[in-house]
Amino acid sequence: MNLAVQSLAENSETGMTQLSDTVFTQHFNEPLIHQVVTAYLAKARAGTHAQKTRSEARGGGAKPFRQKGTGRARAGTIRSPLWRGGGRAFAAKPGDYSQKVNRKMYRAAMRSILSELVRQDRLRMIDKIMLSKPKTRDLAKLLKPITWRSVLIVVAEDDRNLELSARNIPTVAIRNVSRVSPVELIRFDGVLVTGDAIRCFEESLT
């Protein structure tokens, strides 16, 4: 398929480029995308939550009152889950929430996401984006014609000036094509991809 190449500096189309049908014309596989995105979000969980059971709560070794004759319900410890300050009945413990996603599933999900972004006109190809120095104002000026509320810019190589310029714009993110995740592709309203990054996608996902 063909995709227009846009110039941010001139705010116009500079030509057309041929995209790989293997990567950019796949059907929308929602169950697979859901599984991969869920795995990414699960792996991001710290899993450090911890609560104390009745045996771990400090104190409570002595029986609070005698078994019979008080009229109260019997109790053997003040750290029972029924008591204020007691341990939790089903205490949360640190755990690993990561899920396995093999390479074949990941590549298929990425192809499906990229194809759907192209169909929805949420992925646009730009010729290049370069800044001579880190300046937020310069980057904001380049992106001013873009109507998306949030923009993900995918580049082939790390650009320190570009990253520093976008750091103070909360709705803009810069990602290297090798580090972009399915979650980020879905989360942003639109994705700008350089020509070199498009070729990297085609090489890595075929």
From Swiss-Prot:
Pfam families: Ribosomal_L4. The gene is rplD. One of its GO terms (biological process) is translation. It comes from Nitrosococcus oceani (strain ATCC 19707 / BCRC 17464 / JCM 30415 / NCIMB 11848 / C-107). Part of the 50S ribosomal subunit. One of the primary rRNA binding proteins, this protein initially binds near the 5'-end of the 23S rRNA. It is important during the early stages of 50S assembly. It makes multiple contacts with different domains of the 23S rRNA in the assembled 50S subunit and ribosome. Belongs to the universal ribosomal protein uL4 family. Keywords: Ribonucleoprotein, Ribosomal protein, RNA-binding, rRNA-binding. This is Large ribosomal subunit protein uL4. SUPFAM superfamilies: Ribosomal protein L4. The keyword Ribonucleoprotein applies. One of its GO terms (cellular component) is ribonucleoprotein complex.
